[in-house]
Design a protein with these regions (language model features):
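A short acidic-to-branched-hydrophobic micro-motif
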Residues: 112-146
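Solvent-exposed, non-transmembrane alpha-helical starts
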Residues: 137-141, 189-192, 222
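Extracytoplasmic/secreted envelope proteins and their assembly/folding machinery
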Residues: 90, 142-149, 198-199, 223-230
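Signature of long, low-cysteine stretches enriched in small and polar/charged residues
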Residues: 100-112, 146-200
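N-terminal targeting sequences that direct proteins away from the cytosol to non-cytosolic compartments
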Residues: 4-116, 120, 161, 167, ...
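Beta-strand elements of well-folded, non-transmembrane domains
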Residues: 132-135, 182-186, 205, 217
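Coil-to-beta-strand transition motifs
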Residues: 123-124, 173-175, 203-210
């Protein structure tokens, strides 16, 4: 049978319980303070990095622009490739080089260049390909569209639904287009997502230009961006 506790023993046990609870509180406070400091340092690091390299660079590289922001921001007019094509766009397209393509050009091709913004599963992306021929070759636009749809598959598109039609912008430039939907695997969500695309092919003696626009399904801002880019297109004559 347990002996009854004395008042001194009870006081000691009570004091021990109080001490344990106080230690637990201090531990929680230290953890919270540590987490707060870590979060502050992370935010501070991002801000300093963004200030150093530019907020546009950080947003572009890590967060991306919404199509509404792209549509409403100040646009840039640039010249790309050969034969040169001039377009206005919300962001400058960056040249990409595929050594395999460059080292295996068809006999009649003088040069080809590729420029891009974004990736296939981004809210909005563009690929522009320019090709210069050694002679006054004018490509078959229907065959070019078929090749471009195969190129879309290389980008990662699956279940491609295709519609075709004519293209003409406000400046009178005309060509062929293919448009529709596809699915692509999104590494962020680890799921297939449904996208829309517009492909345009323009041709002139000695050269051709091909556009790929890819965007989230039913994104009205993306459609307005595409229309605005299309209407800005100007072509330079192919160099002889």
């Amino acid at each position: 049978k347990a002996l009854p506790r004395t008042e001194d023993q009870a006081a000691i046990l009570f004091a021990e319980e109080v001490r344990k609870k106080e230690m637990q509180k201090q531990k929680v406070k230290r953890l919270a303070l540590s987490a707060g400091i870590s979060a502050f340092l992370l935010v501070a690091s991002v801000v300093i990095f963004a200030y150093t390299v530019g907020f546009d660079f950080v947003k572009d590289s890590y967060f991306g622009y919404s199509t509404k922001e792209l549509l409403e921001k100040e646009w840039i007019t640039s010249e790309y490739g050969e034969p040169a094509i001039i377009i206005s766009s919300p962001k400058v397209l960056k040249r990409t080089i595929d050594e395999k393509i460059q080292n295996n050009l068809p006999e009649n091709v003088k040069s080809t260049s590729r420029f891009a913004y974004g990736n296939i599963t981004d809210d909005f992306s563009i690929v522009l390909i320019t090709t210069a021929y050694k002679d006054t070759t004018k490509i078959d636009l229907d065959l070019a569209l078929e090749a471009d749809l195969k190129e879309l598959e290389k980008f990662g598109a699956k279940n491609i639904i295709v519609k075709t039609g004519e293209f003409e912008n406000v400046k009178g430039l005309s060509g062929k287009k293919a448009y529709g939907t596809f699915t692509a695997f999104d590494p962020d969500s680890e799921e297939d997502i449904k996208m829309q695309y517009d492909i345009m092919v323009l041709s002139q003696p000695g050269g051709a230009q091909e556009f790929f626009f890819m965007y989230r399904e039913e994104d009205e801002y993306a459609k307005q961006i595409i229309e605005k880019i299309q209407n800005s297109i100007e072509l330079r004559k192919a160099k002889k």
